[in-house]
Regions:
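PRPP-associated nucleotide enzymes
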Residues: 1-265
Length: 265
């Protein structure tokens, strides 16, 4: 789904599936024009290429906003798999945007490969906002990082002392987590916890983390992620009593639930 200057770009289909993009409704500004891509599927990349090429012909400069950077998971070559993120970044660079803004990239490789890239640390902002909401002086609040990568990333971004970090052991053949432990000390018998990460799919890791936190005395457990996929409805996060609420954005998520608070970006 593509927006140009906050207006959704109209795309129709020919009978054979080819796209027909209407340009007469594009509201062009004198400066600071922007294309915003809410990635749903690979068609969005094709439409982005067509729209930017059209604007180039009109000599209209433009910035690109990516609430979610597509193909961030494929940030390296493993065996015979294709380094998809590298090739997508090359395509975006060739479109020659004035700037490319990414919200909470899943991989730092994205910003390394993109020209004129800017990053919005959205999970940091969401976590800090929730910390203020929960700070009532009655129960201690701990930030919980679900793995070493999250601890390294958000430990630098968020200035907060009460930290717990999970360490996990995976079965490399199946991908399932065999063991998970919480590292760090809790000073009181009861506390509230905020798990912070960038992305949630079905939420298996977060369920295991929350289960361990409950054993340690957590009374309320919140999950903060910038990107929440619709597959969260296929997992147990929303049906279990372990998670009190999920704080996320509309970068990917397109469904509603009473336990999910969505911030628009």
């Amino acid at each position: 789904m593509i927006y140009f200057n906050s207006e959704r770009v109209e795309v129709k289909k020919f009978p054979n599936g080819e796209s027909l993009i209407h340009s007469e409704n594009l509201k062009v500004r004198s400066d600071d024009n922007e294309i915003r891509v809410y990635f749903e599927n690979d068609e969005d990349i094709t439409h982005l290429m067509f729209l930017k090429s059209h604007l180039d012909e009109l000599r209209i400069k433009c910035n690109l906003i990516l609430p979610y950077m597509p193909y961030s998971r494929m940030d390296r070559t493993e065996g015979i798999t294709i380094f998809t993120l590298k090739h997508l970044c090359k395509l975006i660079n060739n479109l020659n945007f004035e700037s490319v803004t990414i919200y909470e990239p899943h991989s730092e490789v994205s910003t390394a490969l993109l020209d004129r890239a800017k990053v919005v640390n959205m999970s940091k902002m969401l976590a800090e906002r929730l910390l203020k909401e929960l700070d009532n002086g009655k129960e201690e609040v701990y930030l919980v990082y679900p793995d070493a990568g999250a601890a390294k990333r958000y430990g630098k971004e968020i200035g907060y002392e009460k930290i717990l970090t999970a360490s996990k052991e995976r079965d490399f053949k199946t991908g399932f987590i065999k063991k998970l432990e919480i590292n760090g000390c809790v000073e009181s018998k009861s506390f509230r916890a905020i798990i912070v990460d960038d992305l949630c799919s079905k939420g298996g890791t977060f369920m295991l983390t929350a289960s361990k936190l409950k054993e340690m005395g957590a009374t309320e457990i919140y999950l903060v992620v910038t990107h929440c996929e619709n597959t969260v409805f296929q997992g147990e996060l929303l049906t279990s009593d372990l998670i009190t609420g999920i704080y996320t954005t509309n970068s990917i998520l397109s469904k509603d639930h009473k336990k999910i608070k969505v911030y628009e970006i």
